[in-house]
């Protein structure tokens, strides 16, 4: 456990962070999502519902049973039509890319490599400690992207160029084909654009340019690319169908996507199964032969209603929500607004929404803990089945579950192991967590792991408590990102001392076909 002097003992939520009683948490009878991770299922390839026939954007069937009734007092106004011109700036970070964890991209989350990918069966390995990619010598990286259910990754260079690598059986790398790529490769068709941000779903990708345009590629059978159709796979980048204000942030769940515009409006598209799109419906309907299908959103649709629930169960609209940040788990969503409030919605299993119950939420609902003076949130992060927030006082809060076979935390609780640390970047994998705080990098996660914790060869492979990553001692992590079972770090290399430290790390030069 990393030890540090507590600097914010009077901050909110510094009580004991004991996990909630799991028996109580399970009392609602919430069944486990079939898209949740399982050791014996193909987690990364599962997709909700059935593809079925075409389900158009306007084919609405109203709220599903159990959906929150929309407050009638809310007046919805569409965003202004006068489109602004913006120039977004990317991350201020600049450094070298480090990788550790599983790199057999076609095997991650699966019992075996699919037959169509058999040629790649023996490629890749588990990297138990940080490595440098040999092919990236001299390449300065600004930011990286992956996702808690993703087996592919992207990086953005200081020049704003987009590179990708990893699993590619749905074209999620954007190179116009479905061939796996083991080392980062520039996306040639996008080299004329300058990118500032990217996000990865299970098998799809969104990338944001400096002028607020969004490119999408990869799997699209649930409409998660926002192209107005349900083409199974789109291997070449295409701009989403959207004509509103410039976009400033993108996020991806497993089979859905979120975008935020420069006015603070929020839009979603893709699979609505657990209400994760925020449109007061799970989109479920009975199709032919009593099959359940989903009315997917094929183009970006604005989320217009935000609510809070009182102790007596009364539902009240929350006006004047201006979105400032978004984060998505497998099938739940979080936002941070201009008043430092946090809202969550989607699948409620394991308490990942933070509302002290496991009910699914069909529209964004206020997380009460952060709605008090001095208790607002400054950062939000979504894991596969959990959520994190950093308070404006610097405290790190957690809710949900990282190990779904153990106790769940039904509402935000302080992470005592990191009390007093200044968190600047946090990422969640399938069940592992990594944090960049102060001058250290800290990680933890239950077994099984594949090296994503970075503890090194001949060291413990897992930890249920936060541990400093000693293999990164003296190396400053500007950004940390996790995929399903791998970790990416943007390591600062501004000084000669930085460069010398990084040179001592081993190079990774994977065998390719």
Swiss-Prot record:
GO terms for molecular function: small GTPase binding. Residues 1-70, 492-513 are annotated as: Disordered. One of its GO terms (biological process) is positive regulation of attachment of spindle microtubules to kinetochore. Keywords: Cell cycle, Cell division, Cell membrane, Centromere, Chromosome, Cytoplasm, Cytoskeleton, Membrane, Mitosis, Nucleus, Repeat. Residues 492-506 have a biased composition (Basic and acidic residues). It is found in: Nucleus, Nucleolus; Nucleus; Cytoplasm, Cytoskeleton; Chromosome, Centromere. It is a peripheral membrane protein. GO terms for cellular component: chromosome, centromeric region; cytoplasm; membrane; midbody; nucleolus; plasma membrane; spindle. Its main location: nucleus. Pfam families: WD40_RLD. RCC1 repeats lie at residues 94-156, 159-210, 212-262, 264-338, 339-392, 394-438, 439-492. Residues 20-34 have a biased composition (Basic residues). Residues 309-316 are annotated as: Required for interaction with RAC1. Interacts with RAC1. Interacts with CORO1C. Multifunctional protein that may affect its functions by regulating the activity of small GTPases, such as RAC1 and RALA. Required for normal progress through the cell cycle, both during interphase and during mitosis. Required for normal attachment of kinetochores to mitotic spindles. Required for normal organization of the microtubule cytoskeleton in interphase cells. Interferes with the activation of RAC1 by guanine nucleotide exchange factors. This is Protein RCC2 homolog. It comes from Xenopus laevis (African clawed frog).
């Amino acid at each position: 456990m990393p030890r540090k002097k507590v600097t914010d003992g009077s901050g909110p939520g510094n009580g004991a962070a004991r996990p909630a009683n799991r028996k109580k948490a399970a009392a609602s009878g919430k069944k486990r999502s079939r898209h949740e991770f399982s050791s014996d299922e193909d987690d990364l390839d599962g997709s909700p519902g059935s593809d079925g026939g075409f389900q158009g954007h306007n084919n609405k069937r109203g709220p599903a049973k159990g959906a929150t009734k929309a407050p009638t007092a809310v007046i919805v106004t569409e965003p202004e039509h006068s489109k602004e011109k913006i120039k977004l700036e990317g991350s201020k970070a600049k450094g070298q890319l480090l990788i550790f964890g599983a790199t057999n991209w076609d095997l991650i989350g699966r019992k075996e490599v699919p037959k169509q990918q058999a040629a790649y069966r023996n490629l890749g390995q588990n990297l138990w400690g940080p490595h440098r990619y040999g092919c990236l010598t001299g390449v300065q990286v600004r930011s990286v992207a992956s996702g808690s259910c993703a087996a592919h990754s992207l990086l953005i260079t200081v020049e704003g160029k987009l590179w990708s690598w990893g699993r590619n059986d749905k074209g999620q790398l954007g190179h116009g084909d479905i061939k796996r790529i083991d080392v980062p490769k520039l996306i040639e068709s996008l080299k004329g654009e300058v990118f500032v941000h990217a996000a990865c779903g299970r098998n799809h990708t969104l990338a944001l340019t400096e002028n607020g345009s969004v490119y999408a590629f990869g799997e699209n059978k649930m409409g998660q690319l926002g192209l107005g159709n349900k083409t199974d796979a789109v291997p070449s980048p295409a701009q989403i169908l959207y004509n509103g204000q410039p976009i400033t942030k993108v996020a991806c769940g497993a089979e859905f996507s979120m975008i935020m515009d420069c006015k603070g409006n929020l839009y979603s598209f893709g699979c609505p199964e657990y209400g994760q799109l925020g449109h007061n419906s799970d989109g479920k309907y009975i199709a032919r032969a009593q099959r359940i299908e989903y009315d997917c959103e094929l183009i970006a649709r604005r989320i217009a209603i935000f609510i809070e629930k009182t102790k007596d169960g009364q539902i009240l609209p929350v006006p004047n929500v201006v979105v400032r940040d978004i984060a998505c788990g497998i099938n739940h969503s979080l936002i941070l607004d201009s008043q430092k409030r946090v809202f969550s919605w989607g699948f409620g299993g394991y308490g990942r929404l933070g509302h002290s119950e496991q009910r699914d939420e069909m529209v964004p609902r206020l997380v009460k803990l952060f709605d008090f003076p001095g208790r607002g949130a400054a950062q939000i992060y979504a894991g596969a089945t959990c959520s994190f927030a950093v308070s404006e006082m610097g405290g790190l809060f957690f809710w949900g579950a990282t190990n779904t076979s153990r106790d769940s935390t039904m509402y935000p609780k302080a992470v005592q192991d990191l009390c007093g640390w200044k968190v600047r970047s946090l990422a969640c994998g399938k069940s592992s967590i990594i944090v960049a705080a102060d001058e250290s990098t800290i990680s933890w996660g239950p077994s099984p792991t594949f090296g994503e914790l970075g503890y090194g060869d001949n060291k413990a492979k897992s930890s249920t408590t936060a541990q400093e990553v000693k293999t990164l001692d003296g190396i400053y992590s500007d950004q940390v990102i996790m995929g399903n079972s791998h970790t990416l770090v943007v390591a600062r290399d501004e000084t000669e001392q930085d460069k010398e430290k990084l040179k001592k790390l081993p190079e990774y030069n994977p065998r390719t076909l």
